[in-house]
């Protein structure tokens, strides 16, 4: 059987790939791998289960809970919550593991299952592979009588999380007017409450979830409504989440987007000033803009680049003791307070920096100037040879030499298709386009699969 787990758990069409049967049996397997193999003898393991509000989350959540409880795991049902809230609760109540039911920024018909290790951390690939092996073997445990798991509603789950968030920010938000776009998702209740508790005047859009409208024309993948609301209301800034609120993008008072790279730059500078940025280092990915590198160099901050995916950012952070990292898409990990990307925490910290400095977000964002970027997908090519083909590597080297310190080149093979993504950043858009097209020609000439 091919690997069930993708880059962020199991994800697909609910009742298509992701059936109730699959959800229950994966949970039975996780009960063994994450629960019984670690819990003290004679003690039932515990797990937190949460979901993001999609209609399908109700039956998938029921299947997950059934799989866990029937395997002798005590379940704390946290209801509809952001992914980072579920991760926080796993650590807060010292559960053995957690399960988040969400498809993040995907449309409503999709759903997903993400297992969280003890402490709320994402699972390494090897542990996911072990869960799949147990799932395929169908060698589940089936306790009876007093050994079956019990299900408890965690009624104060959201309140615990909000208290944690508000307690983390270094400066209150009194006097700030903020528009929140909750993507009709899991943060529709928690985010407005957290920002209000922190002192902000809050206006909310995209906070009327009906199970079918998550990410539908709102949220971090659709910033138009937020930009319009900020301008019309004369707000200081806007914050957008995705469906499970593990990411955050922002707009300034003019409605101009502030992306994940800019947010990380603002937070890194703030943390360095406060003496709280471990080793004066930020972890981003190979996709982060060269402008971030240049701005951090100016601020005396080291940029470490990881592979694309917040899990790889986190792996680098944990391995080296760094405490700030993230992606251009708005996944920002602040390891002093969270084990995963947290859109609410990120938004609160960003707003706190605005309040602390008295500077508009527009001015803070100018710390970093985004370099013009051109990305072209080259199809039907031998993606495996992209990093070994001598003519292609020579073309890349020539491009890098021409661009010098004011440009950057990245050839990134697709994980699922015979495609190589050619990305070039340069001082001008025209330079980036010209150099990218030359590289595309080299890739097509030397890596084409067509006979």
Swiss-Prot record:
Leading EC class: isomerase
Post-translational modification: Activated by phosphorylation.
Ribonucleoprotein in keyword set: no
Known cofactor(s): Mg(2+)
Keyword Thylakoid: no
Residues binding Mg(2+), per UniProt: 104, 242, 244, 246
Cofactor note: Binds 1 Mg(2+) ion per subunit.
Residues modified to Phosphoserine: 104
Catalytic reaction list: alpha-D-glucosamine 1-phosphate = D-glucosamine 6-phosphate
Enzyme Commission designation: 5.4.2.10
Residues at the active site: 104
GO molecular function, one term: phosphomannomutase activity
Top-level taxon: Bacteria
Entry GO CC: cytosol
Xref: InterPro entries: A-D-PHexomutase_a/b/a-I, A-D-PHexomutase_a/b/a-I/II/III, A-D-PHexomutase_a/b/a-II, A-D-PHexomutase_a/b/a-III, A-D-PHexomutase_C, A-D-PHexomutase_C_sf, A-D-PHexomutase_CS, Alpha-D-phosphohexomutase_SF
GO terms, biological process: carbohydrate metabolic process; peptidoglycan biosynthetic process; UDP-N-acetylglucosamine biosynthetic process
Keywords: Isomerase, Magnesium, Metal-binding, Phosphoprotein
Main function: Catalyzes the conversion of glucosamine-6-phosphate to glucosamine-1-phosphate.
Membership in a protein family: Belongs to the phosphohexose mutase family.
NCBIfam families xref list: glmM
Name of the protein described by the UniProt record: Phosphoglucosamine mutase
Organism annotation: Kocuria rhizophila (strain ATCC 9341 / DSM 348 / NBRC 103217 / DC2201)
Higher taxonomy: Bacteria, Bacillati, Actinomycetota, Actinomycetes, Micrococcales
Gene: glmM
């Amino acid at each position: 059987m091919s690997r069930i787990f993708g880059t962020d758990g199991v994800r697909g069409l609910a009742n298509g790939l992701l059936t109730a049967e699959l959800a229950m049996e994966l949970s039975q397997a996780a009960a063994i791998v994450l629960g019984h193999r670690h819990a003290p003898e004679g003690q039932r393991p515990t797990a937190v289960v949460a979901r993001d509000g999609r209609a399908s989350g109700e039956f998938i959540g029921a299947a997950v809970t059934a799989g866990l409880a029937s395997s002798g795991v005590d379940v704390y049902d946290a209801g509809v919550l952001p992914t980072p809230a579920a991760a926080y609760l796993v650590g807060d109540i010292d559960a053995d593991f957690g399960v988040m039911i969400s498809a993040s920024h995907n449309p409503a018909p999709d759903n997903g299952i993400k297992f969280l290790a003890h402490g709320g951390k994402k699972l390494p690939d090897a542990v996911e592979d072990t869960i799949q092996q147990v799932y395929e073997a169908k060698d589940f445990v089936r306790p009876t009588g007093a050994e079956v798991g019990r299900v408890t509603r965690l009624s104060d789950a959201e309140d615990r999380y909000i208290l944690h968030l508000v307690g983390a920010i270094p400066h209150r938000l009194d006097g700030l007017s903020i528009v929140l776009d909750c993507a009709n998702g899991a943060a529709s209740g928690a985010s407005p409450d957290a920002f209000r508790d922190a002192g902000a005047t809050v206006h909310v859009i995209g906070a009327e979830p009906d199970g079918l409208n998550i990410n539908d024309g709102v949220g971090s993948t659709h910033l138009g409504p937020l930009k319009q609301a900020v301008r019309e209301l004369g707000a200081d800034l806007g914050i957008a989440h995705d469906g499970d609120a593990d990411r955050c993008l922002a707009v300034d008072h003019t409605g101009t987007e502030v992306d994940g790279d800019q947010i990380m730059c603002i937070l890194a500078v703030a943390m360095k000033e406060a003496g709280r940025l471990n080793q004066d280092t930020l972890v981003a990915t190979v996709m982060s803009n060269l402008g971030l590198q240049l701005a951090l160099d100016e601020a005396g901050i080291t940029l470490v680049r990881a592979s694309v995916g917040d899990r790889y950012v986190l792996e680098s952070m944990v391995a080296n003791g760094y405490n700030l990292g993230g992606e251009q898409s708005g996944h920002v990990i602040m390891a002093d307070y969270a084990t995963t990307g947290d859109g609410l925490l990120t938004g609160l910290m960003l707003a706190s920096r605005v309040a602390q400095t008295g500077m508009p977000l527009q001015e803070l964002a100018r710390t970093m100037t985004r370099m013009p970027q051109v990305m072209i997908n080259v199809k039907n090519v031998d993606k495996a040879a992209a990093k070994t083909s001598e003519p292609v590597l020579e073309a890349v080297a020539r491009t890098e030499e021409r661009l010098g310190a004011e440009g950057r080149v990245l050839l990134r093979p697709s994980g699922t298709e015979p495609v190589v993504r050619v990305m070039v950043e340069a001082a001008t858009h025209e330079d980036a386009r010209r150099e990218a097209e030359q590289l595309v020609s080299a890739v097509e000439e030397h890596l084409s699969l067509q006979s």
